[in-house]
Regions:
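Aliphatic-rich helix starts adjacent to a transmembrane/signal segment
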Residues: 1-42
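Flexible, low-complexity segments enriched in proline/glycine/serine and punctuated by aromatic residues
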Residues: 28, 32, 36-170
C-alpha cells in the first residue's frame, strides 16, 4: 500500500515536471518569434529612415504584401542590384524594401503591415507604425488602411493572446 502511494506521488511529480518542460519550450518558441519579428521590423524601419524621399510610399508598399498566401514575387526593378539601383526612384526603393521585409517574414511564418500608430487619429501629423504577426493572429490590409484589430486596440493595448508586435517607424 505504501509503495502505491509513493508511486502515485512520483507520477504526479513527473507529470508536473513534464508540464513545466512543455511550458518552457513554448516560452522559448515565443521568444524566438519576438526576436525575429523585432529584427525584421527594425531593418525595415532603418530602410524607411534611409529613404526620406520615399517615406510616403512605404505604407502602401508594405500593405501590398500583408495578406499574401504564397511567397511574394520580386518587383520588376531590383533596387539592391548595383547596376539597377541608380535607376531606382524613392518609391521603387520603398516597394523593394517592403518586398524584402515581407519575403523574410513570410519564410518564417509571419506577416507585416504598416498603418497609423494607435491613438493618433486626431493628430495633425500621424506617426506610422509597423506591425508583425504570427501563428493565429492575422493582419489584413487594403492599399489605404490596415486592420490590426486582432493585434491591438485603437488605444494601443495588445489583444489578450495575440501574437504580434508593433514598432513605431516614424
Amino acid at each position: 500500500m505504501e509503495a502505491l502511494v509513493a508511486l502515485l506521488l512520483l507520477a504526479i511529480g513527473v507529470l508536473g515536471y513534464s508540464a513545466l518542460q512543455l511550458r518552457a519550450i513554448d516560452a522559448s518558441s515565443e521568444a524566438l518569434y519576438r526576436s525575429q519579428g523585432m529584427l525584421i521590423l527594425r531593418g525595415l524601419a532603418d530602410n524607411i529612415r534611409a529613404n526620406p524621399l520615399g517615406q510616403s510610399s512605404y505604407p502602401t508598399a508594405v500593405r501590398g504584401y500583408t495578406s499574401i498566401k504564397t511567397a511574394p514575387t520580386a518587383p520588376t526593378v531590383n533596387c539592391y542590384n548595383a547596376a539597377e539601383a541608380q535607376r531606382c526612384t524613392p518609391a521603387q526603393m520603398a516597394t523593394y524594401d517592403a518586398y524584402l521585409a515581407e519575403k523574410t517574414a513570410f519564410e518564417i511564418g509571419m506577416h507585416i503591415t504598416m498603418d497609423d500608430c494607435p491613438g493618433v487619429s486626431v493628430a495633425p501629423v500621424k506617426r506610422q507604425c509597423l506591425f508583425i504577426a504570427w501563428d493565429d493572429t492575422t493582419l489584413t490590409a487594403t492599399a489605404t488602411t490596415a486592420n490590426i484589430s486582432n493585434c491591438m486596440s485603437d488605444a494601443g493595448v495588445y489583444v489578450a493572446g495575440s501574437k504580434c508586435l508593433m514598432m513605431e517607424a516614424y
